[in-house]
From Swiss-Prot:
<dbReference type="Pfam" id="PF01782">
    <property type="entry name" value="RimM"/>
</dbReference>
<comment type="function">
    <text>An accessory protein needed during the final step in the assembly of 30S ribosomal subunit, possibly for assembly of the head region. Essential for efficient processing of 16S rRNA. May be needed both before and after RbfA during the maturation of 16S rRNA. It has affinity for free ribosomal 30S subunits but not for 70S ribosomes.</text>
</comment>
<dbReference type="InterPro" id="IPR009000">
    <property type="entry name" value="Transl_B-barrel_sf"/>
</dbReference>
<dbReference type="InterPro" id="IPR027275">
    <property type="entry name" value="PRC-brl_dom"/>
</dbReference>
<protein>
    <recommendedName>
        <fullName>Ribosome maturation factor RimM</fullName>
    </recommendedName>
</protein>
<keyword id="KW-0963">Cytoplasm</keyword>
<dbReference type="GO" id="GO:0005737">
    <property type="term" value="C:cytoplasm"/>
</dbReference>
<dbReference type="InterPro" id="IPR002676">
    <property type="entry name" value="RimM_N"/>
</dbReference>
<keyword id="KW-0698">rRNA processing</keyword>
<comment type="similarity">
    <text>Belongs to the RimM family.</text>
</comment>
<dbReference type="Pfam" id="PF05239">
    <property type="entry name" value="PRC"/>
</dbReference>
<dbReference type="InterPro" id="IPR011961">
    <property type="entry name" value="RimM"/>
</dbReference>
<comment type="subunit">
    <text>Binds ribosomal protein uS19.</text>
</comment>
<dbReference type="GO" id="GO:0006364">
    <property type="term" value="P:rRNA processing"/>
</dbReference>
<keyword id="KW-0143">Chaperone</keyword>
<dbReference type="InterPro" id="IPR036976">
    <property type="entry name" value="RimM_N_sf"/>
</dbReference>
<feature type="domain" description="PRC barrel">
    <location>
        <begin position="102"/>
        <end position="185"/>
    </location>
</feature>
Length: 191
């Protein structure tokens, strides 16, 4: 199968083995529990390897109060086998993505979208990640826009609350997000 980054969606990362019978603890990166609870085909991607391998999800259940699922995968029968999968990503094909409501987005759609200041039109940076907490946060890699900043070796990143008041425009067709950053927010990337 051709490996195209856009055809895969990460749903979690295997963080450890659980018990002696091959169960795995998976840190979820999805808001859809059925991706762990409904058996079927998933893909495993080893660290530093762009080529996922198909595997069957046998079962999965959430750990109460945590963003962790305990899953069973076909062919993983003991703790030693489970331990070898630490750090692997669990993926689904993007054709399996659920339909979203208006103004809902999949994380993979937002990564690498350019971020502009809503009022000035100035290019500010690029979305590099999204953190799902109480309120979603966009992580933005800021561009260097002055000689002083260009001399800094440290990358400048900021977290922007992904709420309409701060992010009024998401235009995926044009690879553009516009933000109204509160005063001082962008300078936080300097520290």
């Amino acid at each position: 199968m051709e490996n195209n980054k856009n055809q895969w969606l990460e749903i979690g990362t295997i963080v450890s083995a659980r018990g002696l019978k091959g169960e795995l603890k998976v840190l979820s990166s999805t808001d859809f529990p059925e991706r762990f609870e409904i058996p079927g085909k998933r893909w495993l991607q080893p660290p530093h390897d762009p080529y996922p391998q198909a595997i069957e999800l046998i079962s999965g259940k959430s750990v109460a109060g945590k963003n962790i699922y305990i899953v069973r995968l076909e062919g993983i029968e003991n703790r030693n086998q489970a331990e070898t999968l630490r750090g692997y990503k669990l993926l689904i094909m993007d054709q399996e993505l659920p339909e979203l409501e208006e103004e809902e987005y999949h994380v993979s759609q937002l990564i690498n979208v350019q971020v502009y200041h809503h009022k000035t039109g100035e290019l500010l940076g690029t979305v590099i990640d999204l953190f799902t907490t109480g309120h979603d946060l966009l992580e933005i890699q800021l561009i260097n826009n002055s000689e002083r900043e260009a001399k800094k070796t440290k990358e400048r990143k900021v977290l922007i609350p992904f709420v309409y008041e701060i992010v009024p425009v998401v235009d995926l067709e044009n690879n553009r997000i516009e933000i109204n950053p509160p005063k001082g927010l962008l300078s936080l990337g300097d520290s």
